[in-house]
Amino acid sequence: MTWNQALSDFNLYLKIERGLSQNTIASYSFDIDKLISYLDTNNITSSPIHITHLTIQQFIYQISKGMNPRSQSRIISGLRSFFSYLVFEDYRPDNPIDLIESPRIGRKLPDTLSLIDIDRIINAIDLTKEYNQVRIGERDRTMLETLYGCGLRVSELVNLKISDLFFDEGFINVTGKGDKQRFVPISSTTQKYINIYIRDVRSAIDVQKEYNDTLFLNNRGKQLTRAMIFTIIKKLAAEINLNKTISPHTFRHSFATHLLENGADLRAIQMMLGHESITTTEIYVHLDKKQLKKAIQTYHPRK
């Protein structure tokens, strides 16, 4: 079995059997491609069936120079999944990654924005800005209001459809990881901006046929990419001299943190974020020590 054949079969397994998104599959492939390139560069002819843990360990050592433990751990995890698949399919008897120790990593707390910073970023958008007669400033404001107002992942934002909007009921239908769907409440404020965008901006775009139902479009009538959203946010952060590195995911983290600070139930936040496990959502508890202290002072019988 060649590396390309093994990788192709693995990607198909991830898509069909595990129902993973294309972005997640691409992340797995990226790390395995690095291993393949390493073997080619060093004239190592080991196949995926016969490669040893020593060769893989040398590869990890080579690419890990200057890499933080979390990134190293992610690569090892991806390779472990790949070789576990080969073992599962009886292509090889063992998983060589089992003999490689992952670096110890702490649980990184996500960066968040204050409400003031979020307002500063959104207010920095030039609402008069046009490109090919498309008011992209209005569009950008609506996207950021939706990111923060609904706690969406960037992939969920760019894939949002007009048919996913159920404003009369106060919800939107979000397609998350693994094509799993969930209903997320949407505030009247976010609804207002989306309605303005659809009425005044999207209606003026010459929409490509395959994107008739896609909510957020570029000036050519096509779906926005995740990279474009990252670029928009980076530019706005630079304009206001924000002293932290942010991404679209920062708005999602801020959404969850602000809900928790204002008394929302952790399981409700879990459902809105689309986390399968409550332990993933529990990371936000660690962000708000004041809230935890207040809970003890307010509710514990021994004040």
Predicted segments — roles?
Residues 1-303:
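Conserved catalytic core of the tyrosine transesterase superfamily
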